[in-house]
């Protein structure tokens, strides 16, 4: 971006995979700032917990609306620009053919990822099927594609305003997305989470399903993360503040039970079939993760189930998705933290941003109105659910959004 500075947008306390982050957004913001980021902005929950398509669209909108960002840098497994652009063109110009092929493949019993791969291989005869299939097998590459699509859409809408975004794909190195190997220099996020969330067989606390093993946050962590991030997460683990999805099991069950008569079909990523399965199997509910595994089917992935259940928990409905692709979708920019020596960036955004900039939660009521304020309050409610769950886990009250200061380093 201009001025030689960089900002980062963070997904909230809840993630695109349909699970909570293991550490709260303020701790992760501090990690990002100490790791070199100049400014951290929050992606609202409706986008942060959505599928890759909407998640990427929200991220591009958020950065574009700062008025100062000119380049989006993202990681991918294989930065094959030519193949990415070819796929983006197919998805943009041959969307109906693509959807027809995907639908046909899924009717034959193939899950969506396989149907997507089959459709794109058919529509891209100039590339070998092995190359296309291998590219699509990586979740990071899928997100990279969605970023490219979102950037193309942003540029087509904003070209008259001379505010064009470019992309800079960076090839990831080290372990793969699903690798669980620890003690290596470039471990996957999965491996880091597993190292932190290893259950202790000797812990007799059964009030929640996740117990932190006293030694698990030390072995290999300093090899896998920068020193500042490793020490912050180690301290978090020592305080028993790390959360996994099963920490929200009771909250999810009570929510599903309360919706028994209404059903869940109106919630984002759910639909009538999944709503019916939820109703059928609710009596067998033991935990968030167990119930998601129970509900998965050949045509519905575990991640999709988790995302649907999270949307039910966070009250994100199909109607909320209507705004996700709209050019004016992101209604505000909320600052989670910044470096003191990069205040020039914050000043530039205050001057150039096309939507209100929120640096203090208490000021939002006088700055935001209508749907913008409604979305903000929803984000506050999501954060409060995460905070309350953490507070109950350690039996200590934690500061809410109105008392949580902005992170400065």
Predicted regions and their residues:
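Short N-terminal binding/cap micro-motifs at the start of the first secondary-structure element
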Residues: 1, 15-18, 178
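Short, small-residue-biased leader/transition segments that mark boundaries at the very start
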Residues: 2-9
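Short loop/turn motifs at secondary-structure junctions
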Residues: 4, 36, 67-68
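Short active-site-proximal "capping" loops at secondary-structure junctions
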Residues: 11-16, 46-48
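N-terminal beta-loop-helix "entrance" segment that forms/cooperates
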Residues: 13-25, 30-33
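A glycine-rich helix N-cap at a beta->alpha junction
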Residues: 34-44
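Active-site cores that bind ATP or allylic diphosphates and position pyrophosphate for catalysis
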Residues: 43-409
């Amino acid at each position: 971006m201009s001025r030689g500075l960089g900002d980062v947008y963070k997904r909230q306390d809840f993630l695109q995979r349909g699970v909570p982050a293991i550490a709260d957004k303020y701790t992760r913001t501090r990690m990002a700032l100490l790791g070199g980021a100049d400014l951290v902005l929050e992606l609202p929950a409706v986008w942060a917990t959505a599928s890759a398509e909407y998640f990427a669209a929200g991220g591009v909108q958020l950065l574009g609306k700062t008025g100062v960002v000119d380049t989006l840098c993202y990681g991918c497994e294989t930065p094959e620009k030519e193949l990415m652009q070819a796929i983006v063109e197919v998805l943009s110009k041959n969307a109906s053919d693509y959807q027809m092929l995907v639908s046909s493949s899924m009717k034959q019993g193939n899950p969506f990822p396989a149907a997507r791969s089959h459709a794109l291989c058919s529509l891209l005869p100039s590339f070998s099927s092995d190359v296309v299939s291998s590219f699509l097998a990586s979740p990071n590459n899928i997100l990279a594609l969605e970023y490219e699509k979102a950037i193309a859409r942003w540029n087509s809408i904003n070209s008259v305003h001379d505010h064009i975004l470019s992309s800079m794909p960076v090839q990831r190195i080290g372990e793969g997305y699903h690798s669980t190997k620890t003690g290596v220099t470039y471990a996957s996020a999965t491996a880091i989470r597993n190292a932190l969330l290893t259950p202790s067989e000797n812990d007799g606390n059964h009030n929640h399903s996740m117990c932190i093993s006293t030694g698990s946050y030390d072995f290999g962590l300093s090899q896998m993360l920068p020193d500042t991030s490793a020490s912050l997460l180690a301290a978090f683990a020592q305080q028993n503040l790390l959360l996994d999805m099963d920490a929200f099991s009771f909250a999810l069950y009570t929510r599903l039970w309360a919706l028994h008569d209404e059903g869940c079909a109106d919630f984002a990523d759910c639909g009538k079939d999944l709503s019916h399965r939820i109703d059928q199997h609710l009596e067998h509910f033991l935990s968030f993760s167990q119930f998601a595994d129970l509900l998965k089917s050949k045509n519905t992935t575990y991640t999709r189930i988790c995302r649907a259940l999270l949307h039910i928990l966070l009250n994100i409905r199909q109607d909320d998705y209507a705004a996700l692709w709209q050019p004016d979708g992101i209604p505000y920019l909320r600052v989670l933290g910044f470096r003191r020596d990069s205040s020039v960036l914050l000043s530039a955004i205050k001057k150039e941003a096309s939507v209100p900039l929120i640096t203090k939660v208490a000021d939002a009521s006088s700055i935001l109105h209508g749907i913008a304020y409604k979305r903000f309050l929803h984000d506050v409610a999501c954060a409060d659910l995460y905070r309350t769950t953490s507070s109950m886990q350690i039996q200590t009250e934690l500061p809410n959004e109105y008392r949580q200061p902005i992170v400065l380093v």
